[in-house]
Amino acid sequence: MIRLLFISHTGNNEPPMAQCIMDHLIQKAGLTDSLSVSAAAFAKEGAPLSKAAQETLSAHGIPYTMKKAFPIAWKTYDDYDFILLMNDKNNPDIFNTMGGDVDEKIHLLSEYAGKEADIPNPHKGGTFEDAYEEEEKACEGLLKKLEAWIR
């Protein structure tokens, strides 16, 4: 089982839409026995998806759950195979909280869409639709890579 962890934008405690998008893509590809998806945040307590995020996902036919993002802890690094950030790969909180990236598990999600940029933050000037589009492209790219390993 390959375990994926999506980490919220810095300063946001709700799970990224990417968690729901990837979960949906995994189910469509029939890979639920091979891949699992979770979400975390740098907050002490996570929050469920915002109403705007729920509406954006619904508009694209993506089911969502009301699960909260869990707070990142030191052991989080060891529990996941891929740790996917929405923004700021050089955020010191990542390394202070998880102790670094010796196994090179931490990546910007956008890398899987062929970009080196942050995913637009819908809580700080970006739109939920912009964030959805970037997250979807990146999740599709990541799934393609993972499928090649699994199959």
Where are the predicted features?
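Conserved active-site segments centered on acidic
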Residues: 1-79, 144-151
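Phosphate-binding/catalytic loops
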Residues: 82, 88-151
